[in-house]
Amino acid sequence: MQQTAWAPRTSGIAGCGAGGVVMAIASVTLVTDTPGRVLTGVAALGLILFASATWRARPRLAITPDGLAIRGWFRTQLLRHSNIKIIRIDEFRRYGRLVRLLEIETVSGGLLILSRWDLGTDPVEVLDALTAAGYAGRGQR
């Protein structure tokens, strides 16, 4: 059976949250100067908020009977077949490493970019599933 929902890995989100908690504890107990305490406290709060918002936005991309559901931190966007112009993979080298992004371009001119972090897997696998579901490729409705 084909996978129909993609989300960031639970371990990655938990790692960010745990790192934020450890940093917050270190900020209160280990850092003695006020500016350092404020900076590490703000960084800890940022990590905790990032982990919370990322957890809330799961699954990031899902194939539903109504269309493609793309969840963000604050809302879910539903894209029907008629709203999607093209779905493609963008590949480029960054720091000697090949990076792939899944790009979903809408008819209204919007561009949604999803990385491996967002999808929890290789974007090429997601594109294959979207092609099999009729959202991309020659069989596009």
Curated annotation (Swiss-Prot):
UniProt protein name: Uncharacterized protein MT0013
Native species: Mycobacterium tuberculosis (strain CDC 1551 / Oshkosh)
Bilayer topology annotation: Multi-pass membrane protein
Subcellular location: Cell membrane
Ranges annotated as spanning the membrane: 12-32, 35-55
Cross-referenced InterPro entries: CFP-6_PH
One of the record's GO cellular component terms: plasma membrane
Domain of life per record: Bacteria
Main location: membrane
Keywords of this entry: Cell membrane, Membrane, Transmembrane, Transmembrane helix
